[in-house]
Structure formats: structure tokens, C-alpha cells
Amino acid sequence: MALRANDASFTTNDQVISALNEQSQAHSEVISQIFSEISKSIVGQKDVVEKIMVALISDGHVLLESVPGLAKTLLAKTISEVLGVSTVRIQFTPDLLPADILGTKIYKKSSEQFDIEKGPIFNNFILADEINRAPPKVQSALLEAMQEKQVTIHGETFVLSAPFLVMATQNPIESEGTYKLPDAQVDRFAMKILISYPSIDDEKSIIARFASSNESLVNPVITSDKVIELQKFSQSIYVDESIINYVTRIVDATRNPQNYNLDLKNAIEFGASPRASLWLIKTAKALALIHGRGFVIPEDIKSVAHEVLRHRIILSFEADVNKISADQIIDTILENIQIS
């Protein structure tokens, strides 16, 4: 039986669920304050902000795809200020070197010895702007740091600060002078979030806000310690066996659509990896926590499915020719795969 918000027939100890709900609601109130503070600076984009928070709480990284000028830098800066963590923007260019990100050894004449000069990777929030403009060596250096949460500089290993979130951006339009991220490396991002243009009303609000002389300042709501606490607590959010079965069937449908009577085989070159199943569960837990629940419901899975799966489904040539997108495939799967 699936756990739902209005379902009293839990398949685990009711007291455990009740305690998780109580703690989740307390954490959710704090998270609501975070969203409220962010909205002082960021107009609209509520779903984008929520999904970035989902990635952060689930201890994952984000690939942001949007055209230039949609306030990605302001978004990263605002979120980091509200969370009381450090942030840095790294502009990826063809001449960037791994040492420019990680750091290097520098000879100090005064001490007559080499000292480690740490790079910008030693911040909590990293905005890797236009990651696909840097050569593969630089991309690999960043992606290894994302995976291991540590870097090695001239044989010396340094653990990165926690929390650690990389928000990498890429432009969906321009391809000249770019290096395509390998599919295996893209898979390391927990979520791929698409940022769209603001609505007319939101754009009016943006114009009015920038026309005003009053600067929208935000204040820290929590500290990095609280972020880590949220990350740890989200791991304890309850997931029913039926939810796990639901997730595995969704992911399997990207690999073997014919087993679910889905006519998608010719559109998919390769389906999602097992990492997709793990991130569907982890991000759904984070979303449940944000909404003040101590357990995951099917709607949580559906809500994060596009962001978790869209960059993990490798489309076939036929799909490209027929302009079939990964999101369309995910829509079809979600419409046909039901929880049991």
C-alpha cells in the first residue's frame, strides 16, 4: 500500500512517522523563511529556487540550462547569503586551467618555501558559469571535486567545505567554442534544471524593482551548520516499499519501455543509470521535508522526475530527427507507470 498524505494505514510504526512529521514541520517552517527571504531579491522562479534547495538538501549538484540574462549569478549569490554560506562565480573559458579552480603551490620568497594557494573551489556554493566552454581537463577537475568532495593539489589532499553545492550553467543555444560535457560526467549532476523566461507580470515586477533606488538586501536566515542538519535529517525521511518499487519501474521504463507497453524504444539510445533511482529517492525525501512531511508520496517522485531524469536519458538519432525531447519521454512514462 502506498503512503499518502491522507492515508492512516501506514506500513511502519505510526509513532515513528508521527515523530518524523513533527520534526519535518519544524524544519519546513525554517525553510519557508528561507524562501520568503530569497523572494526579496529574486522575482518569480519559485520552482527553480525550490528545486535548487532540493538539490542542496539532498547533497547533490545542479546543472542549470538557460539563455544568458536570467539572473543565475544573482540567484546563487542570494541563496548563499540567505543560507549564511560562501559563494563564488567561476567564468569558464577555453584558456582556463585546473589550477585556476583547484589551486596550486606558490613559492614564497619570504619563507623560502612553497605554500598552497587554494583556489575558488574552496567555497560552499560554486557557480560554474558556462561549464561547457572550458576544455575537458578543467571539466574533469571540477566534476571530480563534486564527486569526491575533496581535491588534491601537488599530492596533498584537502577536504572541501560543507555544505558544498556546484551550480553549473550552460547555454542551450550556442555551440561554437564549446566542449560537450560527456554523458558519464553529466550523470554526476543530481538534477538538471531548466530556467525559462519570466512571466509578463514577473518581468513588470523586475523592471519596477530595478527602477527603484531601494536595493533589495537579504539577511541570513540560517548558517552552514543548519544546512548540514537539514541534509542529515532528510536522509531519515521514510520511504515505503511501494515508493521504491514505483521508482525502479519508472527508471526501468527508460531502459526497457517495451516491457511497459510503451512505444519509446526507437527514441531512446540508452536509459537512465541506477544513479537515477538513487537521486529520485534522495531528492523526493528532500522535497517531502521542504513540504513538512516525514514520508515520501508519489507526487514527490513525479515532481522531481524531470529534473533527475532529463539529462540521464540518451536520445536516439530518430528522436532528434522527430524532435522528441527527454521531457516528452518522461511525461509518457509518468502517465503510464502507476504506483502499485
Q: Where do the language-model regions lie?
A:
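Walker B catalytic acidic pair
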Residues: 66, 129-130, 141
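Canonical AAA+ ATPase core
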Residues: 108-113, 130, 134, 138, ...
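Conserved C-terminal "switch" segment of AAA+ ATPases
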Residues: 20-28, 41-42, 192-264, 290-294, ...
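Conserved alpha-helical scaffold flanking the Walker A/P-loop in AAA+ ATPase domains
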Residues: 50-54, 107-127, 156
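Walker A/P-loop
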Residues: 56-93
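C-terminal engagement/docking regions of AAA+ P-loop ATPases
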Residues: 2-20, 24, 258-340
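Conserved AAA+ P-loop NTPase core
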Residues: 89-121, 140, 177-186
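Pre-Walker A (pre-P-loop) alpha-helix and adjacent loop at the N terminus of AAA/AAA+ ATPase modules
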Residues: 23-70
